[in-house]
Curated annotation (Swiss-Prot):
SMART domains: DHDPS. Pyruvate binds at residues 57, 211. The active site is at residues 143, 171. This is 4-hydroxy-tetrahydrodipicolinate synthase. It is found in: Cytoplasm. Catalyzes the condensation of (S)-aspartate-beta-semialdehyde [(S)-ASA] and pyruvate to 4-hydroxy-tetrahydrodipicolinate (HTPA). Its EC number is 4.3.3.7. The gene is dapA. It holds the Pfam family DHDPS.
Length: 301
């Protein structure tokens, strides 16, 4: 294994298992910061060594700037692992403001999604991240999720993004393992899987960890999986991946990850309410049952 490959495997600047944390809300729809602190402590105790707040699973499209800032502060108060804040938008100026304010609140890094809906050119993508980079003081994680953004980012564009001072990592939710290999080799950026079902395959091509939905209730076995992989015990890693497969399907299969993550946490008694803000709707009885069945099949209940 080359020195570069070892760097990809060993350099996990924000942790290995990072739940994309839901934002607990009270029955009136206001953010429940006390419940968020309880959840953050639970996740770390269960094995998470980094947390992502204000991401898609955290209902970032419907939470406001002051709530995002306060959530970062609240979580930072109670955990001693890296706290990454989502700070992405399809409006570059708004993205810059979010980056500045969440950094000031104490975020250890920012997760910046590709500018969705607007469908900019490759030059526009680079311009977006360059503007963010110029205002950043903390590391930037590029979030590539074409299913939500409608963008296909070329390998050459990744080369240009990697030249920016604060761009240090990628959350890859493209599902394209072959392209990920080339992008990693060319950029040297730390790579995080953005897909629970592809965690082990992404590890096999050099990813350092995952930003995950199922880690809300499965951080411990996911840590066991990555540790088994690190020591070369692929049989155990594969067994754990197969064990978690029903949970992956239960929480991700219908595409309502934020809803199902809250369902799983409610079943486990970790959050008091599954309230969500429209256009998302909290889980119904069928979804709660599905979350419970997925956890039970994965040996987590």
């Amino acid at each position: 294994m080359s020195e570069h490959d070892m760097h990809l495997l060993d350099s996990a600047p924000f942790g290995r298992i990072l739940p994309a944390m839901v934002t607990p809300m009270k029955s009136d729809g206001s953010v429940d910061f006390a419940a968020a602190q309880k959840l953050a402590k639970y996740l770390v105790a269960d094995g998470a060594d980094g947390l992502v707040v204000n991401g898609t699973t955290g209902e970032s499209p419907v939470t406001h700037m002051d709530e995002k800032v306060e959530l970062v502060r609240a979580v930072k108060e109670v955990v001693d692992v890296p706290v990454i804040s989502g700070a992405g938008s399809n409006d570059t100026a708004h993205t810059v403001r979010m980056v500045e304010q969440t950094q000031e609140a104490g975020a250890d890094a920012v997760l910046v999604v590709m500018p969705y809906y607007s469908r900019p050119s490759q030059d526009g993508i680079v311009g977006h991240y360059k503007a963010v980079d110029e205002s950043a003081e903390k590391p930037i994680i590029v979030y590539d999720v074409p299913g939500r953004t409608g963008l296909k980012v070329k390998v050459g564009t990744y080369d240009r993004l990697a030249e920016l001072e604060h761009v240090k990592a990628v959350k890859d939710a493209t599902g394209d393992l072959a392209a990920a290999v080339e992008k990693q080799q060319r950029t040297g950026l730390a790579w995080y899987s953005g897909d629970d079902g592809l965690f082990l395959p992404f590890l096999s091509i050099g990813a350092v960890g995952i930003i995950s939905v199922i880690a809300h209730v499965a951080s411990n076995p996911m840590q066991q999986l990555v540790q088994a992989f690190d020591r070369g015990d692929i049989t155990t890693a594969r067994r754990l991946a197969n064990q978690l497969a029903p949970l992956v399907h239960a929480l991700n299969g219908d595409g309502y990850q934020a809803v199902m993550a809250k369902a799983a946490l409610k079943v486990k008694g970790v959050i008091p309410s599954t309230t969500m803000r429209l256009p998302n709707i909290g889980p119904d009885a069928t979804q709660l049952d599905k979350a419970e069945e997925g956890m039970r099949a994965a040996g987590l209940l």
